[in-house]
């Protein structure tokens, strides 16, 4: 038993130091290559697979699929102002740009080379990408700003749509509350938020994540690595929305729960700003 515990701790330490090496040492070097050469520019509007830290699979197809899903529930036109929270390396931004479906886009992320790549790939003046030097245990371990203290660099009521894909599925309660409050501050009255999450009550036998451990309102997959997968109850989201003059307008259940035949992997919550 003790041997197993020791091995687990060793594995966790090894994993931690590998992440530190990748994102504290290698990541800045990648940023320099992206900024000053064309070696990592990618092809056909997509980054090289080695740079795509957001998700595995077909970058173009995934972006188009997400934007199509958003468009089924949220009106998009040449006047729509979009905030992309955790924009990554531009999976959604490049899809919006290809389809020319919106009027203004702002995205931010904690991985600098992702922001640098986006700035090179999308030159449209309606699009802007901001580096957020937020501390993140996985992607930005030496970040200068704590997530709970971060203020989105945008004016009040300056967006019609806020998007967060696979962001709240990795945030503890304190950070979730801060990001949600900031998103609602930035949304105009009547604006909508398209957020993905794991709704804890949706779990069934065979669910991808058990989310068996509680940390405050959050339910996590692993106590030793809590940001691996984080879920919340629908009641939590409803209370949070009410605190910020918003309501849940639409819910789409995801297949992570163990249910078959669903369109999305993560659950989708669409909020409407009422005040």
Predicted regions mapped to residue ranges:
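Class I (Rossmann-like) S-adenosyl-L-methionine-dependent methyltransferase catalytic domain
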Residues: 2-73, 89-96, 101-151, 177-178, ...
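Conserved class I S-adenosyl-L-methionine
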Residues: 79-88, 106
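Short glycine-centered segments of the SAM/dcSAM-binding site in methyltransferase folds
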Residues: 81, 190-192
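Structural signature of beta-strand start/N-cap positions in the alpha/beta core
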Residues: 81, 104, 158-160
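A conserved beta-strand element that flanks and buttresses the S-adenosyl-L-methionine
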Residues: 163
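Short catalytic micro-motifs in class I SAM-dependent methyltransferases
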Residues: 166-167
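Helix-capping/helix-break motifs at membrane-protein junctions
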Residues: 172-173
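A short glycine-rich, Lys/Arg-flanked "PGG" loop and its adjoining helix->strand segment in the class I
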Residues: 177-189
């Amino acid at each position: 038993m003790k041997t197993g515990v020791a091995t687990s701790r060793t594995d966790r330490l090894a994993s931690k130091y590998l992440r530190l090496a990748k994102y504290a040492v290698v990541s800045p070097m990648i940023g320099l290559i992206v900024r000053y050469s064309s070696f990592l520019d990618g092809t056909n509007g997509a980054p090289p697979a080695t740079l795509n830290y957001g998700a595995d699979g077909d970058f173009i197809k995934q972006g188009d699929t997400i934007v199509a899903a958003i468009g089924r529930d949220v009106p998009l036109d040449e006047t729509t102002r979009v905030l992309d929270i955790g924009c990554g390396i531009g999976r959604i931004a490049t899809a919006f740009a290809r389809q020319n479906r919106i009027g203004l886009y702002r995205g931010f992320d904690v991985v600098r080379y992702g922001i640098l790549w986006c700035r090179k790939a999308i030159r449209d003046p309606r699009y802007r990408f901001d580096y957020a030097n937020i501390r993140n245990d996985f992607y930005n371990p030496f970040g200068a700003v704590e997530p709970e203290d971060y203020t989105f660099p945008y004016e009040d009521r300056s967006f019609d749509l806020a998007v967060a894909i696979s962001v709240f599925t990795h945030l503890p309660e304190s950070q979730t509350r801060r990001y949600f409050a900031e998103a609602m501050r930035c949304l105009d009255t009547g604006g909508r938020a398209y957020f993905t999450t794991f709704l804890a009550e949706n779990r069934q036998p065979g669910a991808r994540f058990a989310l068996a451990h509680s940390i405050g309102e959050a339910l996590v997959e692993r106590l030793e690595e809590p940001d691996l997968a984080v879920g919340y109850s629908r009641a939590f989201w409803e209370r949070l929305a009410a605190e910020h003059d918003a309501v849940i307008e639409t819910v789409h259940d995801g297949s992570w729960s163990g249910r078959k035949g669903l369109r999305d992997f993560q659950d989708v919550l669409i909020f409407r700003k009422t005040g």
